[in-house]
């Protein structure tokens, strides 16, 4: 049964999709077909023989579609590359990003789809399906590929004498199919992801599949065969250029392969970790920004940690665990205490790292054998020349590398020179170091022996020294007088950070600046408590958030892949590694220390108080805001808002409080988040909708406590509203209810939500609410149909919209403005539909404003098109809010231009525009993250668009 089905599916797919191309193939006269281009994206809908019902409504990088009782159906949108006649490799890294609500009911799948020519080939990257997984058991198994957090099975199937781009032909099909579907049958699946298309192409080539042809297209495809279903493709983007995303896989670039070929399967992850590997430790949801990525890419962790041993950064930095900063710098109140003294004072490596707790089962063995840390640092007993004595050639690389490659384990082993028989190679090559030398004492334990925030050295001496000690003198230059203080006297961080006084050691004594506030205290201040280094780096489980070196022009790209740290250190400049113009400020701009390390949780730290680094980030939450904040700059025009998810409220707290006086919960007030099915069934009597604000609680409390106004989003929406809400007894299997019952449910949902907000958050300013969201099709066809909206299915007309606004007007708190919100609102036909509904509601006295979501791109719409829609909405006499602004781009200058124009329009019409909301805080958390659509990049780094927008308000 399945085999016959797949043959029909494949046949239908081929004939369908070749019609979508610019090939000399003509659809059957009986076929239903629409094709076109919107905003630079090609689209097509095809319904074989015109059977059943099928529709597609395209927008700029988005579309909706539905099908029922069809033979074969597809709807697709993407980019066509045929005119360029190039192999896929010529385009760099091709990435497709999608945000889709996909509802398959039977045989259907959602995939990335396309062709190559010369030779002819058709391909699929399948993300989800309904009741059958393509391509069944047909074809040859070609292995697997792991990409973007998923594992895909690779198959090759053949089509013989079938329709194709080039007429009837015989050609292969290549498949990557997720081992676990991203969707389930007979339900709405909220699918959001990024597909590294190039990585699949590379994997196919590596598996022996011919990828020599010219790329024809890359599209997102929704397909159905003898089934029903629908999809709301909220966004699809195809970008190319740049380097391929390793997806956290590291491919051939892991510790073993790059720098330690003798370790076999004992890579860095296994080496110090057991069940808490290095990836886990540093990759708390950071996607591509784990330490492996950062410390790998032809520059392994050894290089990273011993870069200081290569000129400025050594194991001293890396291994400070249980000895606080004060002690470290002031062993016995020695103000000029240098690195030599640091490791001495009877505080050898055993004592220093293990507090007498590890005995003979760990680093004690590794770094000791009667060769304590002092000896390691002072091979020649140069107590006053520390690193100079150790680094006679100003370069650890010269001592421990061949061909400028940090391969400790091949020649001149560090331990062979310095450690008797217990060399570093042994430590790295014990085939699971933990098992042989650590037993159950893994790296996390070693790093967290009483620490909480694993140490300053680890960051500081890996980040800053090159900036201050340039020109091939590394540790010698830094440590000429054996004094940490000297490092900061003449080459202060201040020089790189304007007025942010980095000079910890003004009095040549850390204690003078920090008093008795040691590093542990500094990191914990009652704020961090049990937050260890893992948490410190990943406070918010950010995706590429925080210290996103890889997104800050990661050093491998700037600093020769073949030249390891020598390549980086030849110029002895951290700036070169972390920034383009040897200026940390170029990359960090306003990204303060507190933001990076503490994400708003170190407010009262001495560091903040002593060094002013966090000048712009400390509780800047007055209503007007400072002039260097968005809300401050635009305070005389309108509120500045953003959308947030709860996970960002801790890590980004200071950033949010500084820049925004309005917050929209990204998902937590949508119907699926607030409707309580269990309570509805127990207490609802089939009509009284029960509400829970538990998922929104953290966001609501944050707004209330910090005086930030709330934009509610949303009550009535065809999407993210559970099907059971429309059925008898609030049951998934019940019949759909009548209009009368639905009216009662709608009224009680709105009434109970406002009541809960008032009772649970009495001081919260709910200043506006999206009552209805995304009602209309993109083509001027009016409201969505019953096949795409349960509201329309039950009501059959727009009466539910009128009722929703009526109930909201009745129950909303005083001062809360009621909005009709929609996207692609600048498409002229849709502009008219929104305008007409708004005027209808205005005549009834139920509406206050129109929400323009404003999901834009630099290539569509232009500012004039947008202004036309804005003026149409303003002509209603209602308020207009820009509610979800983002602008995708491939060119930051073009993005800055359009942001400037949109803000200028808003400022010119601020009498009717009370708020502008940016849909997200930083690119890495955006739903369109692959196209960098926001004002801030990873780590809350201001972009050119931010600068242009801020300049408008001056």
From Swiss-Prot:
Documented EC number(s): 3.2.1.8
Q: Where is the signal peptide?
A: 1-27
Q: Which residues form the active site?
A: 122 (nucleophile), 223 (proton donor), 774 (proton donor), 884 (nucleophile)
Pfam families attached to this UniProt entry: Glyco_hydro_10, Glyco_hydro_11
Q: Where is the GH10 domain?
A: 624-952
Q: Which reaction does it catalyse?
A: Endohydrolysis of (1->4)-beta-D-xylosidic linkages in xylans
Stretches of Polar residues bias are at 233-243
The Swiss-Prot or TrEMBL record annotates one GO molecular function as: endo-1,4-beta-xylanase activity
Q: Per the record, which residues fall in region Disordered?
A: 233-628
Task: Specify the protein name.
Answer: Bifunctional endo-1,4-beta-xylanase XylA
- Which organism is this protein's natural source? Ruminococcus flavefaciens
The organism that produces this protein has a lineage beginning with: Bacteria, Bacillati, Bacillota, Clostridia, Eubacteriales
The record's gene field reads xynA
């Amino acid at each position: 049964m399945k085999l016959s089905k797949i043959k029909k599916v494949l046949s239908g797919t081929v004939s369908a999709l070749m019609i979508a191309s610019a090939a000399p193939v003509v659809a059957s006269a009986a076929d239903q077909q629409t094709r076109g281009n919107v905003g630079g994206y090609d689209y097509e809908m095809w319904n074989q023989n015109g059977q059943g019902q099928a529709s597609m409504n395209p927008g700029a990088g988005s579309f909706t579609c539905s099908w029922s009782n069809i033979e074969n159906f597809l709807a697709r949108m993407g980019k066509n590359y045929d005119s360029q006649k190039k192999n896929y490799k010529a385009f760099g890294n091709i990435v497709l990003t999608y945000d889709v609500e996909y509802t398959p009911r039977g045989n259907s799948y959602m995939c990335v789809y396309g062709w190559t020519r010369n030779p002819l080939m058709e391909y699929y990257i399948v993300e989800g399906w309904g009741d059958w997984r393509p391509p069944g058991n047909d074809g040859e198994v070609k292995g697997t590929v792991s990409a973007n957090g998923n594992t895909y099975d690779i198959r090759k199937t053949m089509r013989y004498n079938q329709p194709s781009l080039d007429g009837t032909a015989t050609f292969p099909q290549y498949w990557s199919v997720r081992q676990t579907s991203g969707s389930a049958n007979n339900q709405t699946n909220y699918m959001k992801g990024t597909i590294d298309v190039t990585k699949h192409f590379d994997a196919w080539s590596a598996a022996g599949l011919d990828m020599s042809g010219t790329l024809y297209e890359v599209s997102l495809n929704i397909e159905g065969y003898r089934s029903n279903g629908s999809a709301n493709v909220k966004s699809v983007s195809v970008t190319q250029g740049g380097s391929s995303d390793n997806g956290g896989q590291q491919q051939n670039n892991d510790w073993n392969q790059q720098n330690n070929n003798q370790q076999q399967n004992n890579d860095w992850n296994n080496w110090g970790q057991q069940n808490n590997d290095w990836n886990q430790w540093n990759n708390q949801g950071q996607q591509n920004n784990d330490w492996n990525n950062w410390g790998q890419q032809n520059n392994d962790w050894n290089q990273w940690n011993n870069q200081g041993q290569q000129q400025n950064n050594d194991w001293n930095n890396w291994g400070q665990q249980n000895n606080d900063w004060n002690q470290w710098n002031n062993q016995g109140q020695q103000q000029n205490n240098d690195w030599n003294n640091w490791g001495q004072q009877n505080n050898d490596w055993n004592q220093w790292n293990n507090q007498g707790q590890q005995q003979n089962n760990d680093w004690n063995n590794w770094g000791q054998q009667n060769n304590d840390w002092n000896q390691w640092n002072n091979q020649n007993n140069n107590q006053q020349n520390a690193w100079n004595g150790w680094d006679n050639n100003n370069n650890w690389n010269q001592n421990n590398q061949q061909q400028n490659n940090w391969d400790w384990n091949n020649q001149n082993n560090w331990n062979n020179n310095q450690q008797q028989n217990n060399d570093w190679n042994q430590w790295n090559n014990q085939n699971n170091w933990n098992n042989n030398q650590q037993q159950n004492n893994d790296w996390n334990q070693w790093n967290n022996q009483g620490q909480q925030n694993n140490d300053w050295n680890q960051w500081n001496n890996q980040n800053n020294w090159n900036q201050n000690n340039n020109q091939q003198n590394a540790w010698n230059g830094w440590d000429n007088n054996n004094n940490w203080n000297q490092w900061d006297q003449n080459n202060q961080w201040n020089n790189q950070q304007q007025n942010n006084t980095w000079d910890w050691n003004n009095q040549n004594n850390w204690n003078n600046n920090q008093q008795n506030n040691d590093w542990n205290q500094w990191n914990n201040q009652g704020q961090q408590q049990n937050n260890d280094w893992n948490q410190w780096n990943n406070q918010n489980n950010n995706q590429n958030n925080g210290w996103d070196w890889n997104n800050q022009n990661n050093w491998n790209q700037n600093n020769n892949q073949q030249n390891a740290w020598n390549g980086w250190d030849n110029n002895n400049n951290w700036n070169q590694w972390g920034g383009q113009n040897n200026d940390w400020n170029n990359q960090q701009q306003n990204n303060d220390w507190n933001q990076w390390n503490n994400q708003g949780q170190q407010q009262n730290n001495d560091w903040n108080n002593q060094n002013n680094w966090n000048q712009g980030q400390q509780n800047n939450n007055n209503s007007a805001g400072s002039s260097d904040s968005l809300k401050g700059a635009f305070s005389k025009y309108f509120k500045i808002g953003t959308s947030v998810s709860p996970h960002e409220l801790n890590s980004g707290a200071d950033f949010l409080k500084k820049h925004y006086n309005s917050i929209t919960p990204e998902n937590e007030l949508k119907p699926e988040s607030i409707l309580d099915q269990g309570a509805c069934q127990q207490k609802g009597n089939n009509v009284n909708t029960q509400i829970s604000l538990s998922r929104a609680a953290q966001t609501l409390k944050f707004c209330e406590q910090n005086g930030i106004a709330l934009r509610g989003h949303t009550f009535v929406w065809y999407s993210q509203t559970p099907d059971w809400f429309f059925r008898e007894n609030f049951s998934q299997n019940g019949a759909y209810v009548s209009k009368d019952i639905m009216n009662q449910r709608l009224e009680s949902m709105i009434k109970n939500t406002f009541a809960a907000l008032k009772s649970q958050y009495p001081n919260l300013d709910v200043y506006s609410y999206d009552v209805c969201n995304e009602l209309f099709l993109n083509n001027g066809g009016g409201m969505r149909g019953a096949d795409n909206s349960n509201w329309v299915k039950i009501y059959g007309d727009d009466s539910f919209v009128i009722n929703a606004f009526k109930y909201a007007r009745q129950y909303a708190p005083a001062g809360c403005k009621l909005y009709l919100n929609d996207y692609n609102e600048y498409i002229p036909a849709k502009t008219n539909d929104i305008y007409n509904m708004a005027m209808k509601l205005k005549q009834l006295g139920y509406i206050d404003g129109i929400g323009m979501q404003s999901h834009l791109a630099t290539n569509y719409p232009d500012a004039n098109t947008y202004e036309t829609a804005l003026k149409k909405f303003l002509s209603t006499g209602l308020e207009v809010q820009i509610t979800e602004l983002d602008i995708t781009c491939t060119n930051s200058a073009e993005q800055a231009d359009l942001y400037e124009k949109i803000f200028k329009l808003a400022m010119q019409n601020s009498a009717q525009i009370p708020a502008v909301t940016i849909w997200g805080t930083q690119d890495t958390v955006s739903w369109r993250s692959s196209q960098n659509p926001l004002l801030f990049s990873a780590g809350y780094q201001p972009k050119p668009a931010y600068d242009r927008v801020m300049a408008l308000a001056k």
